[in-house]
Amino acid sequence: MRKTGLMLIAILCLFLLSRLPAGSCTVFRLKAGDGALIVGRSMEFSVDLKYDVIVVPKNKAYASPAPGGKEGLAWKTRYGYAGMASFGMDYGLSDGMNEKGLAIGVLWFETDTKWQDVAPDDSKQALAQTMLGDWILGNCASVDDVKREIQNLKVFKHADPTLNFSPPVHIIVYDATNGCIVIEYEDGMCKIYDNPLGLMTNAPRFPWQMTNLRQYVGLTSETPGPYEIAGLTFPATGHGAGMFGLPGDFTPPSRFVRLAALTRFADKQPDAERTLNLAQHILNTFDIPSGLVKDTSPDKKTVTKETTQWATFRDLTHRILYFKTYDNQNLRKIDLNRFDFSGTSVKRIRMFGISEIVTDITDQAH
């Protein structure tokens, strides 16, 4: 039964590959007044990918395949980490953070991604693209580490063994010193972009997204004063007129612009706790309820509905991962400082189906 279910999901995912958009993930960073860094991220998809949180210890052995059935890169994790993995797997992270405060976000990338070729003599450097996020968290403590160490890899196109296709993705990486980069693969080359804004959505490529922001330099949080034309006075119709023209749809370019405006103008908060609250408010504006974004197969029989399956908030400074899910908007907390990352087994934390969605405070009346 489980095998049949996974096969059906694979068929749906293959269908999604041929149509746009397939995922509307959104990620951003906020800095508190005391320097604490909070990263917020939403995960949208049209298929239930059966996510759990996995906790991976130090010295956990991993091995990548290589093209042609050869053995690829093998490594043991230097750092323990926690992140979101699908279908019961202990790799293939979409999101996560390690004990050094390094965090990744793996986002769908609707463009002409071309991974690296692997020469016969380079098999031991070959890393399946589905394992890149795991490799980063397990081996790197900073953005500079990633920039340096990734040059030794050959990241190749590899079909996910569960879904039977190779997801087109790009990756954003944050560290606890406010570093941030975007990694995209184009024409078989690894392109790394410094990302001082700390924002990313999906397609087009990151440099295009940054250039597109120039179209919106007139956005402001200030309500404009009245205009006088031909002796007539025209005041703004209401507060918020300074944001007129801010795109409100769910396409990746529009979400990128909206992120830039919200993170630019929202009041900076003094500490991690209140910045976490601000991050929730910002990410709420990108939430996709079921039915709002649909895709239909050519035979009009299959409709996929993209939803915000889960959202994460990572405190890079204090090494705390928070998350909420579509079925339960209550925030849950995972403190990486409390884990003993020794041992070799991967632990799991269930994300969905957790009760106590509503807190009854009736009896607190006095």
PLM features: residue spans?
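Proteins synthesized as precursors that undergo proteolytic processing into mature forms
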Residues: 122-159, 272, 276-281
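Bacterial N-terminal signal peptides
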Residues: 9-18
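Aromatic- and glycine-enriched pocket-lining scaffold segments that form the walls
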Residues: 143, 147-185
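C-terminus-biased signal that marks the final domain/tail of proteins
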Residues: 23-37, 46, 149, 158-159, ...
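A contiguous strand-loop segment
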Residues: 23-124, 153, 157, 360
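Positively charged n-region of N-terminal signal peptides that target proteins for export
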Residues: 1-4
